[in-house]
Amino acid sequence: MKEITAIIRMNKAQRTKDVLLECGFPSFTIRRVMGRGKQRGLCHEFNPPLPDPEKEAETCIRFIPKRMFTIVVDDENVSEVVQKIIEVNQTGNAGDGKIFVSDVTEAIRIRTGESGEATVNKELV
């Protein structure tokens, strides 16, 4: 099993959710998060420039609101889910997001006590 964590633009969250549902992956968690990439957030240029260098630095280094999807799938579905997330979110611009894939050693369905890959299958149980 793998955990897929995708950090994406806020305006792409609904379409990402819709595509995952259409592909048969209805189980995921969405969180509101703040972050920034290598660009250190968006820089706003002011005309005229800000007279205080500290204020200018604060303006350029900020956190951007994002959405974080967490999806646990069996190994055979990782490529499909990752590809669908990329298709929806890739614009070619900085800030499109990141996807992380991690191993999951165990999953337990609290309601039934069931464990293993059966807890993350596509069928409704």
Swiss-Prot record:
Database matches in Gene3D superfamilies: 3.30.70.120
Keyword terms of this UniProt record: Nitrogen fixation, Transcription, Transcription regulation
Pfam family, one: P-II
Gene Ontology CC annotations of this record: cytosol
InterPro entries according to UniProt: N-reg_PII (IPR002187), N-reg_PII-like_a/b (IPR011322), N-reg_PII/ATP_PRibTrfase_C (IPR015867), N-reg_PII_CS (IPR017918)
Any single GO BP term: regulation of nitrogen utilization
Transcription recorded as keyword: yes
Domain of life, per lineage: Archaea
Gene Ontology molecular function terms on file: ATP binding; enzyme regulator activity
Keyword hit for Ribosomal protein: no
Family statement drawn from the similarity comment of this UniProt entry: Belongs to the P(II) protein family.
The protein's role, per its UniProt record: Could be involved in the regulation of nitrogen fixation.
Name under which the protein is recorded: Nitrogen fixation nifHD2 region GlnB-like protein 2
Native source organism of the sequence: Methanosarcina barkeri
